[in-house]
Amino acid sequence: MQIKRWFLNNSLRNYQYLLYDKSHAIVIDPLKSDIFAEFIAKNKLQLEAILITHKHGDHIAGVKKLLAIYPNAKVYAYTENDLFKPDIYVKDGSFINLGFTSFRVMYTPGHIDDHVCFLFEQERALFCGDTLFNAGVGGVQAESADINQLYDSLVKITKLDGDIKPYPAHDYWLGNLDFALSILADDSYFNYYRNQVAELAAEDKPIVNLAEEAKLNIFIRAMSDKALLKALPDYSLGREMFVKLRQLKNNF
């Protein structure tokens, strides 16, 4: 299946994603229903599934309107929320075969306790919601957020094949790289990507694979990068370094 990406240019800088082939469509975390409905109608597709990574409003606001247009579409989510109940409750390791494609569910709490990611192995794509961002990770402001769970979820993602591409729900490239450079100012990867994305519209920013993400993401590098021991000598690599970086990012 092909992957269509839109940037909403709202205050949260949301990305929206749709997978499609000649006949079928899958929507991920719809905030704005109209862009999906227009594309599906124009290309004469059938909306088969709506996948929800977590229940924050900017990931579910468009679900009810899409279901009004496409009542046969099935909603997949870890838990219910204030707007709807899913047709199919998913859990860690759930494997869903839709016939025209399939996906596996990864339970990735930390940003919020109901967060999941959707791994499409054939498409080599991971829809990672607010767990992993380009050059960053999700925030831990929600009531059910847990910084240690977020670390464990990130570790789980880093164990996937390096050629898989993560598709995060927001464009936070610049802010994340600016934070990374505040810690490691001379780092070649941080500087390279900061220069690369500085002048790009969000729609044109690169979609990198996990192998490349591991080089440009300071939170992944917290697991093993000895350069961080010089920058933050009071903290050991791994969970302790990750937690410290996430705390510093909260106030950046």
UniProtKB/Swiss-Prot annotation:
One of the GO BP terms on file: methylglyoxal catabolic process to D-lactate via S-lactoyl-glutathione
A GO MF term: hydroxyacylglutathione hydrolase activity
Obligatory cofactor(s): Zn(2+)
Quaternary structure annotation from Swiss-Prot or TrEMBL: Monomer.
HAMAP family in the cross-refs: Glyoxalase_2
Function: Thiolesterase that catalyzes the hydrolysis of S-D-lactoyl-glutathione to form glutathione and D-lactic acid.
Family designation: Belongs to the metallo-beta-lactamase superfamily. Glyoxalase II family.
Protein name: Hydroxyacylglutathione hydrolase
